[in-house]
């Protein structure tokens, strides 16, 4: 679906098994769009992390263009 296509992750950890088990460990105000199991800490702003595991990593959220925009 579109949720999986638009999902992104900057920090993805995978096991060395075959197939690998991968998990996105990004912490942010929301979880990525394809996340089914999103756990958020009651803080302001909230700190959320996705606890889904899958056999792949999503593409990185930050490409060089976005980083330049943030720095500017």
Curated annotation (Swiss-Prot):
The keyword Transport does not apply. The record marks 42-43 as: Reactive bond for chymotrypsin. One of its GO terms (biological process) is negative regulation of serine-type endopeptidase activity. Disulfide bonds join 8-61, 9-24, 12-57, 14-22, 31-38, 35-50, 40-48. GO terms for cellular component: extracellular region. It holds the Pfam family Bowman-Birk_leg. It comes from the Eukaryota. Keywords: Disulfide bond, Protease inhibitor, Serine protease inhibitor. InterPro entries: Bowman-Birk_prot_inh (IPR035995), Prot_inh_BBI (IPR000877). GO terms for molecular function: serine-type endopeptidase inhibitor activity. The record marks 16-17 as: Reactive bond for trypsin. The keyword Signal does not apply. Dimer. Inhibits trypsin (IC(50)=0.9 nM) and alpha-chymotrypsin (IC(50)=1.1 nM). Belongs to the Bowman-Birk serine protease inhibitor family. This is Bowman-Birk type proteinase inhibitor 2a.
């Amino acid at each position: 679906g579109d949720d999986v296509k638009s999902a992104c992750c900057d920090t993805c950890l995978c096991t060395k098994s075959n197939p690998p088990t991968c998990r996105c460990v990004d912490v942010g105000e929301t979880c990525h769009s394809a996340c089914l199991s999103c756990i958020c800490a009651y803080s302001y702003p909230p700190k959320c992390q996705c606890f889904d595991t899958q056999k792949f990593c999503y593409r990185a959220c930050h490409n060089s263009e976005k980083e330049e925009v943030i720095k500017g």
